[in-house]
Curated annotation (Swiss-Prot):
Source organism of this protein record: Porphyra purpurea
Gene assigned in the entry: ycf46
Domain of life of the organism encoding this protein: Eukaryota
Main localisation: plastid
GO MF term list: ATP binding; ATP hydrolysis activity
Record GO cellular component, one term: chloroplast
SUPFAM superfamilies, sorted: P-loop containing nucleoside triphosphate hydrolases
UniProt binding sites for ATP: 266-273
Location within or outside the cell: Plastid, Chloroplast
Protein name according to UniProt: Uncharacterized AAA domain-containing protein ycf46
Keyword set includes Nucleotide-binding: yes
InterPro entries the record matches: AAA+_ATPase, AAA_domain_protein, ATPase_AAA_core, P-loop_NTPase
Family: Belongs to the AAA ATPase family. Highly divergent.
Secretion signal, residue range per the UniProt entry: none
Keyword tags: ATP-binding, Chloroplast, Nucleotide-binding, Plastid
Length: 491
C-alpha cells in the first residue's frame, strides 16, 4: 500500500486521531484536499497556534493561540458533511494534562461522528497516555514519479523544454528531497545557468549533501574507492559482482527480491569500511553513513523519532547504500537497565525495518567484535549474508602492497620487492601494511631521498600489529568464524 491508500483506509476505519510525521505541510494539505477530501460533501479545516482556523471564511482566526478551544470547536461543530481537522504542531501541547484528557474524551466522541483529526508534526513524541488513541503514519518523501511530474510542471511554468532523458536524470538526482526543496533547487539552477541541463546535476547533488548532513544522523559520504582498490577478499567481491544489478528494473521483473544488505565482521583494518565505499562506487549508488550513536537522544521518545527520520531519509534516497560503521558498539548495552529500555526499542525498530523493508536500501554494517552483537542480529534473514574478514594471507598481502605502491609510485612500484615484503608481515592487516609504507616514506623524506624496500622492511620490523597486542580478541574472532558462523570473505 502507498501513503494515500493507508490514510484512506484509516479514515474509513474510523481511526479518530492520526499523527502524520512530515515536514511537508503544504504537500500533505495538497494530497488531502485534492486526492482524499475533494468532494462537495467533504470539508477540511486547518488550524495552527498563530492563525487559528484558516480554511473556512466563517471561522477564520477562531481558536487563535488556544489549542483547547480548537478541540472544543471540533466537538461542537454540527454539520452533515464529512469533516477532517488538520492541527499543525499540535504535539507541542502534549505536556498539558487538560489537553491530553480532552483529546482522549474527544477521540471517543468523534468515533460515532463523521469527523477525523490529523495532527501534523515533524517529530513523533507521543505520551504513553495517548498511545492507544493516536495512530502514527509517515508521509514518505516524493517518489520518482512525483518528482518527474513536479520537474515537468516547473519546466512548463518557466517555459523550458526538457527531453525525457534529462527529466529522468534530474528526477533521480532529486530523490531524497522534499517537493519544496526540489522547487528551490531547480529555481536556483535556472537562476545560475538560465536553463536546465546536465550542469544542474552537481548543484542538485550538493544541495542534497548539505540537507542530509544537516540532519546530523546521516552523512552523504563521498567515495572514490572501487573493489579493485581492495587487496584480496575475492569471495566477497564475487558475491557483490553477482548482485551488482540487483536494483535494476530487469532484476525486479525477473522476480529477485530486493537485497537487504551485508554484515561484515572482522579484525580492525581488514577492509570493512573500504568495502562499503567500494560497493557504492561499483553499483553507482549514493552512500549514506549513519552515526548510529546519534540516534540516541536524551528526551523520552526522541531516539525512536530519530530512527524513523533516518529510515525516511534513506528510503527517500533509495536505491542507495546505507553504511553503519561499528554497529557492535552502538548496541553493546542492549539489555542493561540504565537507559530505560531505549537501546532495546531502537534496536527492535531497526531490526524490524531491516527484515521487512522493501525499498532498495542496501545496508552494510561493520563490526569489530561479536561479543557485543545481539544474537537477533546474527539470525538468518536479517542480512543477506554475514562475511568474516580475516587477516590477509601471503598472496593477499602481495596484492595490498602492489595497490598502495602503485597508487603513490605509479611509474616505479615494480622496483620494490613485494614478495619479500609480504613474507615479513605475517599477521599484519591491510591498514597496518599501509601505515608501514607511510612510515618508510616519512623516514626517507626526512633524509631527502626516495624510500626503498629496505625502508619498508625496517618499518615493518618496528611495527607491532594488533594480532599481537590484542591476541586473545583476534584469535577469539577467528575461532568464532571458523565454526561456520560466517562466510569467509577470502577464497
Amino acid at each position: 500500500m502507498n501513503f494515500i491508500q493507508d490514510l484512506r483506509l484509516l479514515l474509513k476505519s474510523r481511526y479518530p486521531i492520526i499523527l502524520i510525521n512530515t515536514r511537508e505541510e503544504e504537500r500533505l494539505e495538497y494530497i488531502i484536499k485534492n486526492q482524499l477530501f475533494c468532494l462537495d460533501n467533504e470539508k477540511v479545516y486547518c488550524w495552527d497556534f498563530v492563525d487559528g482556523y484558516t480554511s473556512n471564511p466563517n471561522d477564520n482566526g477562531y481558536a487563535k493561540r488556544n489549542p483547547l478551544l480548537a478541540l472544543e470547536f471540533i466537538e461542537k461543530l454540527d454539520t452533515p458533511y464529512l469533516n477532517l481537522f488538520i492541527l499543525k504542531d499540535f504535539d507541542s501541547f502534549f505536556n498539558d494534562l487538560g489537553l491530553i484528557r480532552k483529546l482522549r474524551n474527544l477521540s471517543q466522541i468523534i468515533k460515532t461522528q463523521s469527523k477525523n483529526i490529523i495532527i501534523v508534526s515533524c517529530k513523533v513524541n507521543i505520551p504513553y497516555t495517548l498511545s492507544d488513541v493516536i495512530t502514527i503514519v509517515d508521509l514518505p518523501l516524493p517518489n520518482l514519479s512525483e518528482i518527474k511530474k513536479e520537474i515537468t510542471r516547473l519546466s512548463i511554468a518557466l517555459g523550458i523544454v526538457l527531453d525525457i532523458e534529462l527529466v529522468n536524470n534530474l528526477a533521480k538526482s532529486c530523490q531524497g528531497l522534499s517537493v519544496e526543496r526540489i522547487r528551490k533547487t531547480i529555481t536556483k539552477t535556472i537562476a545560475q545557468y538560465g536553463q536546465l541541463d546536465s550542469r544542474s546535476l552537481p548543484i542538485i547533488i550538493e544541495e542534497k549533501r548539505q540537507l542530509i548532513n544537516q540532519t546530523r544522523l546521516l552523512e552523504f559520504y563521498p567515495y572514490k574507492k572501487a573493489t579493485e582498490d581492495i587487496g584480496g577478499l575475492d569471495a566477497l567481491k564475487s558475491w557483490l559482482k553477482k548482485r551488482s544489478r540487483s536494483f535494476s528494473k530487469q532484476s525486479f521483473n525477473y522476480g529477485i527480491p530486493t537485497p537487504k544488505g551485508l554484515l561484515l565482521v572482522g579484525i580492525q583494518g581488514t577492509g570493512k569500511s573500504l568495502t562499503a565505499k567500494a560497493i557504492a562506487n561499483d553499483w553507482t549508488l549514493p552512500l549514506l553513513r549513519l552515526d548510529i550513536g546519534k540516534l540516541f537522544g536524551g528526551l523520552v521518545g526522541e531516539s525512536e523519532s530519530r530512527m524513523r527520520e533516518m529510515v525516511t531519509i534513506a528510503e527517500g534516497l533509495s536505491p542507495c547504500v546505507l553504511w553503519i560503521d561499528e554497529i557492535d558498539k552502538a548496541f553493546s548495552n542492549l539489555y542493561s537497565q540504565g537507559d530505560s529500555g531505549t537501546s532495546a526499542r531502537v534496536f527492535g525498530t531497526f531490526i524490524t525495518w531491516l527484515s521487512e523493508k522493501t525499498t532498495p536500501v542496501f545496508v552494510v554494517a561493520t563490526a569489530n567484535t561479536i561479543q557485543n552483537l545481539p544474537s537477533e542480529m546474527l539470525r538468518k534473514g536479517r542480512f543477506d549474508e554475514i562475511f568474516f574478514l580475516d587477516l590477509p594471507n601471503n598472496e593477499e598481502r602481495e596484492l595490498i602492497f602492489q595497490i598502495h605502491l602503485a597508487r603513490i609510485r605509479p611509474k616505479s612500484w615494480q622496483n620494490y620487492n613485494i614478495k619479500q615484503l609480504s613474507l615479513l608481515c605475517n599477521k599484519f592487516s591491510g591498514a597496518e601494511i599501509e601505515q608501514a609504507i607511510v612510515e618508510s616514506m616519512h623516514t626517507a623524506f626526512s633524509e631527502e631521498r626516495e624510500f626503498s624496500t629496505e625502508d619498508i622492511k625496517i618499518a615493518l620490523e618496528q611495527f607491532i600489529p594488533l594480532a599481537y597486542t590484542d591476541k586473545e580478541q583476534v584469535e577469539s574472532l577467528q575461532a568464532w568464524a571458523g565454526n561456520g558462523r560466517a562466510r569467509n570473505a577470502s577464497l
